[in-house]
Regions:
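Single conserved hydrophobic/aromatic residue that forms the stacking wall/gate
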Residues: 2-13, 280-289
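Acidic/polar, glycine-enriched structural segments that form the non-catalytic walls/loops
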Residues: 14-45, 50-51, 56-157, 251, ...
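Short glycine/serine/threonine-biased micro-segments
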Residues: 6-8, 74, 151, 157, ...
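Aromatic-rich carbohydrate-recognition surfaces in CAZymes
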Residues: 66, 158-163, 167-178, 182-279
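Short glycine- and Lys/Arg-enriched binding-loop motifs that mark or flank ligand-binding interfaces
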Residues: 4, 155, 189
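Short Gly/Pro-enriched turn/cap motifs at secondary-structure boundaries
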Residues: 3, 48-51, 222-224
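Intrinsically disordered, low-complexity regions of eukaryotic proteins
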Residues: 4, 23, 164, 230, ...
Length: 289
């Protein structure tokens, strides 16, 4: 095989079986309290395509009365040479390495989520806003619909409108991350003012084909611009400048997707010039703009 998928760490417990489909793991007429995968002790070793996903692994170990053991699994996909270098980090002192990295992860998220905190009489409401709403906004920002579009084969890049909208949810939590993504999406705006309906993962500002080119249509399956894609830059840039006070951002020079460059202000102006004649032809879900 050319790729690693998963690997037991430390006192290696060989992975016996796995499952990527939630319904198969839970089983018919079963639920989270009695999943058939746990009852049977074995899984179907099948992945999942465009259904409800899960990640389940089984391993066999023996415990003496009162004994407990900890297991660690490294899950992901890399080419063999890259994967072996990652796995090597855990070959010595696996437990200490895992504990240290877990603490680093906890510290990272506490830091990210601490930038905006509310306090109301409702602990549940506080937790929803301070933790889960914010965390969900980060996940949406980072993954940009990957689970719902990319992994099921419906998209092979970033959706312009989706990605620009997602930035708004983290501006108050991570303004520098937000600014970098705004710059990225501005660089995916064509010099005519429209946004690339699909921004490739290999995006190369200043050198991209556009929906006007047969090569772009063939590669992405998108034969036309959307009327409102680039217009979503307006509320996003406005919210970033309002939150940070960084008015100089408007004067930054950023390349267009296919050729030329312009200030952020010029990008916004061209978005209006492109879209004003295309009003009333937008995604029904986003007509509020």
């Amino acid at each position: 095989r050319d790729y690693y998928a998963s690997r037991g760490l430390g006192d290696v417990y060989k992975r016996q079986s796995w499952c990527g489909e939630k319904e198969a793991f839970l089983g018919r007429y079963h639920g989270y309290g009695n999943p058939v995968g746990v009852i049977d002790g074995k899984l179907n070793c099948e992945g999942n395509y465009n259904e409800n996903s899960c990640g389940a692994l089984t391993a066999v170990l023996k415990l003496a009365p009162g004994e407990k053991k900890e297991m660690a699994f490294l899950v992901g996909m890399k080419k063999n040479d890259e994967a072996e270098a990652i796995v090597a980090r855990y070959d010595q002192n696996c437990q200490q390495v895992c504990e240290r990295e877990l603490e680093e992860l906890i510290s990272y998220w506490h830091g990210q989520l601490s930038h905006f905190q509310i306090k109301t009489p409702s602990n549940e409401f506080n937790t929803m806003i301070n933790t889960w709403n914010a965390y969900n906004c980060f996940m949406t920002f980072i993954w940009s619909r990957a689970a719902s579009f990319t992994y099921c084969g419906l998209r092979n890049g970033y959706g312009y409108r989706d990605t620009v909208q997602d930035i708004q949810g983290v501006i108050h939590l991570a303004p520098e991350m937000a600014a970098d993504k705004i710059r990225f999406m501005l660089s995916a705006q064509v010099d005519n003012g429209g946004g690339l309906p699909l921004v490739k993962f290999t995006h190369n500002p200043g050198h991209e084909d556009t929906p006007d080119d047969a090569s772009y249509v063939q590669e992405t399956g998108h034969p036309a611009y959307r009327a409102d894609d680039a217009l979503w830059l307006f509320p996003t840039v406005y919210k970033y400048v309002s939150e940070t006070g960084n008015v100089d951002f408007i004067d930054e020079v950023i390349p267009f997707a296919n050729k030329d460059e312009g200030t952020v202000y010029e990008h916004l102006k061209r978005a209006i010039q492109f879209s004003i004649c295309l009003l009333y032809t937008s995604d029904a879900a986003d007509e509020g703009l």
